[in-house]
Amino acid sequence: MAGNSLVLPIVLWGRKAPTHCISAVLLTDDGATIVTGCHDGQICLWDLSVELQINPRALLFGHTASITCLSKACASSDKQYIVSASESGEMCLWDVSDGRCIEFTKLACTHTGIQFYQFSVGNQREGRLLCHGHYPEILVVDATSLEVLYSLVSKISPDWISSMSIIRSHRTQEDTVVALSVTGILKVWIVTSEISDMQDTEPIFEEESKPIYCQNCQSISFCAFTQRSLLVVCSKYWRVFDAGDYSLLCSGPSENGQTWTGGDFVSSDKVIIWTENGQSYIYKLPASCLPASDSFRSDVGKAVENLIPPVQHILLDRKDKELLICPPVTRFFYGCREYFHKLLIQGDSSGRLNIWNISDTADKQGSEEGLAMTTSISLQEAFDKLNPCPAGIIDQLSVIPNSNEPLKVTASVYIPAHGRLVCGREDGSIVIVPATQTAIVQLLQGEHMLRRGWPPHRTLRGHRNKVTCLLYPHQVSARYDQRYLISGGVDFSVIIWDIFSGEMKHIFCVHGGEITQLLVPPENCSARVQHCICSVASDHSVGLLSLREKKCIMLASRHLFPIQVIKWRPSDDYLVVGCSDGSVYVWQMDTGALDRCVMGITAVEILNACDEAVPAAVDSLSHPAVNLKQAMTRRSLAALKNMAHHKLQTLATNLLASEASDKGNLPKYSHNSLMVQAIKTNLTDPDIHVLFFDVEALIIQLLTEEASRPNTALISPENLQKASGSSDKGGSFLTGKRAAVLFQQVKETIKENIKEHLLDDEEEDEEIMRQRREESDPEYRSSKSKPLTLLEYNLTMDTAKLFMSCLHAWGLNEVLDEVCLDRLGMLKPHCTVSFGLLSRGGHMSLMLPGYNQPACKLSHGKTEVGRKLPASEGVGKGTYGVSRAVTTQHLLSIISLANTLMSMTNATFIGDHMKKGPTRPPRPSTPDLSKARGSPPTSSNIVQGQIKQVAAPVVSARSDADHSGSDPPSAPALHTCFLVNEGWSQLAAMHCVMLPDLLGLDKFRPPLLEMLARRWQDRCLEVREAAQALLLAELRRIEQAGRKEAIDAWAPYLPQYIDHVISPGVTSEAAQTITTAPDASGPEAKVQEEEHDLVDDDITTGCLSSVPQMKKISTSYEERRKQATAIVLLGVIGAEFGAEIEPPKLLTRPRSSSQIPEGFGLTSGGSNYSLARHTCKALTFLLLQPPSPKLPPHSTIRRTAIDLIGRGFTVWEPYMDVSAVLMGLLELCADAEKQLANITMGLPLSPAADSARSARHALSLIATARPPAFITTIAKEVHRHTALAANTQSQQNMHTTTLARAKGEILRVIEILIEKMPTDVVDLLVEVMDIIMYCLEGSLVKKKGLQECFPAICRFYMVSYYERNHRIAVGARHGSVALYDIRTGKCQTIHGHKGPITAVAFAPDGRYLATYSNTDSHISFWQMNTSLLGSIGMLNSAPQLRCIKTYQVPPVQPASPGSHNALKLARLIWTSNRNVILMAHDGKEHRFMV
């Protein structure tokens, strides 16, 4: 899914808990979470309460093979990170608090054990992971980036390591790694902090190698209590060794011929050893094993038989002898919480966790009686105890009489074009149902609960037993008929269905086993094969079934082993089949002949050579874990391809690919705001359905449909401003004329979209209807079966209704809840909704049902939450208290959607959805019933205008139609519409600013600043605005102390840029020589393998990797992302809360120095401003760095830099080259008009248009924040430019310079300044006039006059224009008058007054110029020369001026001190060629005659 899409999963688990055959167990350091990995590749997080009660919280998807080991990966108490490894060599770093995957990698080797090791370098703590497995060394991996740093290697008899332990030495700085190889040789490596910090790949050899004759070693553990003993457990005996010289102290055989699988020290004198059938034994060690006793080592050297310790102390047994598929996994942990528990945790193949608390029993002198289990729970039990039961997607349609279990769904496919979900069930029936409607039934309460068999659906019956797979070929390739749906079952048959009529078209019975997979051949196969689908069955056969000819054109059935992979060589007409034994069969498709069968390396090469690998995950047939990664690369993600707007990398291979080249192109939008993906954790499980909501696509769809509604509201300025996404302070830049053009374009694109995507709304042209009828034979209409349009409803609004109802925090504000239910039409959830979280590389965490129920019976004063949610218990409270990442995503989604709905006309979910034909927006042909009347938008000052104001209410035909019956039809629609918008506004405000207070800080998990920072310039304007509002609200909420913490946390990641900022004029080659190493390579640093993943934007592109030099320049994704985030976060804090921001001349309350964050102080007064300088350097670097593949011209990070430079210009100004920055911004918006002219309503802007828009906004902000800086800088550039232009050599490229191309933009900003900051403009009026003269075409001014070309400047009384000889007079602050001659482009200055000039005016015949200054109270008359040559302007002679008269005038008093009236004190009006009136602002007149 595109780099930055905001995609939220909601999961419907169904009543049967997923299979979870546990293969690894871990207890986190804080003792609050148990982590289990299973053989199918999922990881489950279980909450453990202080009373040792367990509640399953989430299931993490991402591994494609069985989990082999788990380890903690972080030692700090605030971060709970774990690392997992699977059989296929994948390693993932997870955040336990919310299930996010932080980093992942894939190695060519399988780890069987990982140990975390932390050491200190100076004052920094570094984490390392020591991994061992099916390879003859120990790999040392960085715990944050998962990069392999170096390895510990054996010189003597290298072999696989079976287990390993780290011995920490408190006396010396050296730590020891002790490992046992498979052959029973003990290896010792010494690891020092110097070695650990080394970055080279030199291996480290062992210090010691000693055979200790321990075969089949299962575990090795170091005694933390005595710091002297080692326990080695082998399958048939266990032994204790002295850690000093590895001499044997004691040994114990296995009990009753059982096999030991592990052990650990319970205390200094007790060990616990467990067997493979789940029993555990505690032994008391003899005194000779205890360093504290006098007889320590007294038995060394005796025969092994004499070293057997006393009989076992306590026997622990499982209470119920369940039959298990494989041995349970047992581990011993001692927690370090307030209650110091020693826990034995065991997980088994049925997904059950058992816990024994050993602390209290270790002291009892007991005999062999069993110790009772403290707690035991399985996933299925956790599901069963919930009321209501966890819902499946079509439970209400799958009720079996006299059974409380519904029919299981065994195969599913979603058809996004129709919004239909097709579910195959275990009884052979197939149900087609509208996905949003059936999800609403399962998740939300409403009138649908009273109807049986709701929503209307269709059932196809044809298979005799379970349906195993479904395929909708048209979705994969448009070459297939869109009516056809293909199903395969356990009855060996493949059936073609017509989904429109519901009839069975054909049955293929060619296989001799159940159908396991249905595939689509690639595009470039032969014409005959193109109309086939490929079916794979469990009798090891593959068929090509032609949908056109209705026959099997080829059956390949000689394979001896199960089929693992199907590949294609269309060019050679080959079908390549890979089997589970490694053999490969090559079949000719046309003839059906077996071309060859090969094994070994040739087989591998053949498979690799098939370029056209059909994206069936390599082992999807043999391995049951159809996890998200595979789903994402298979048809299911041909399904999700719709969400993956324009970048879907091959996640199956985890290759990090860069598609920087794409970034400039406008992404292709699919319009699927909802995707339904069925996943199975195990082949035997029923389907779990995950609904993926793509927030951006949903917003686009809502706006697109809104734009297609033919009401004049579209042209209202409010909406246009919305369209331009202008959060600009400068007004809308779309004028009425362009709006009409835009409206036309919008209608065209909308028509296309609606035709394409809303077929079920039967709102199509007659042509489509006719076509549809022809396609679907006469019986299509006559047959009694309903057509596919089972229920007519608005798919987009339904999706929004479902999503918003699930996200809203119910029960916190009763008044708002009422508004949501009655006015907005949202529905309350039945029970807590299980959301998910997508993270990097298609990894996903899904909340298990009941995740928010406390695992404890009664702890910390929490009362047991009723299983049924009482009305008061807010369902939404659950999601905002889960984790910070979840809160961030949910708040972003709900605020951006609420803002979108608010900008629409009467966007309420109350409609006639439940009835058959709903009221529809009028067709384009129907005239609008009443023209929209806009009333001024009501303003709410929440979050200083960051939350959008309620849009002006607009009447449309639809608002009457949509009235729910409760209102009298006469109630004015205008009012309803206004109330609806106000409702959305309140909803957005509550989630943006009031949640922490309503929920209480103990429950509320605040949003993550860094996640919001990364969306500061999100591609989707609504999400961008929501992120900015949320981030600013959160920064305000945490107040100064919190902001200081954020700065301290992120400042170390801020890249240290060099001071040479590259001006746009400098070529990139020159730039490279200016910069200093190592930063020169910075922006190029490995951004190549940038990965556009599901969660974060390409904000990392182009960030330097130059963290403090003692660390190696890490190029890991996370590191680069942190740098980008640091720049944005510090930029926002600096810009919004930085040094005193006081716009000149406008008296605002100066910020008290205590409010300024440390590091962002003013340059004066000795305050600390280092951070402001570094942040400013980073921002200007990103703006001015020439475009390169590593930092594309319109990347998100560059756009963010533009935005922040504009926002915080007053903070950054002292440290930046203002001229370079302004020119850089002008360069970006030189073509803004062109870019922004062709935007389509609702769709995100193209990256180029977005950059132009941001640059334009930044320029307006800079100009209004510091008008003098802007005016003087641009005037200086203009002078420099004109001087260059005079130099003939550089003439040819003058018109291509930035300044020349951005003339329109400069004029736009000057106009804003004249409008908003007239006083500043008057102070520098001559410079402003210089800029205007440069930007306006001389010929145009001559033809039309200044008044028409640039009316704004003519408002000033100190500017006068004489049309006949094209002269402009401008009065300056220091008493001089500048005279411009437009024909020659020359300027001449005359000095005549001591103070600022108040007014100037040319006489009607142009012979005289009158100037007046209020300060020195003089009016002067100047005579223009009347010589013939001068008047013709020959010889470029400047006009001769002389002062012919000066009069004294009593001064005019301003109306009120300090007001703008100072600019309008008096004006000069010529009544004839010789008479002039000085008109004061209060109406007094003084007449003068020349």
Curated annotation (Swiss-Prot):
WD-type repeats, residues: 17-56, 62-104, 156-199, 324-366, 404-443, 462-507, 558-597, 1351-1390, 1392-1432
Pfam family, one: WDR72_alpha-sol
Modification type Phosphoserine: residues: 935, 1456
GO annotation, cellular component aspect: cytoplasm
Cleavable signal peptide: none
Entries under InterPro entries matching the protein: Quinoprotein_ADH-like_sf, WD40/YVTN_repeat-like_dom_sf, WD40_repeat_CS, WD40_repeat_dom_sf, WD40_rpt, WDR7/72
Keywords: Phosphoprotein, Repeat, WD repeat
A single GO BP: hematopoietic progenitor cell differentiation
Presence of keyword Hydrolase: no
Biased composition (Basic and acidic residues): 768-782
SMART domains: WD40
Region of interest (Disordered), ranges: 761-783, 911-945
Domain of life: Eukaryota
Skewed-composition ranges (Polar residues): 936-945
Annotated PANTHER family: RABCONNECTIN-3B, ISOFORM A, WD REPEAT-CONTAINING PROTEIN 7
Protein name per the record: WD repeat-containing protein 7
Organism: Homo sapiens (Human)
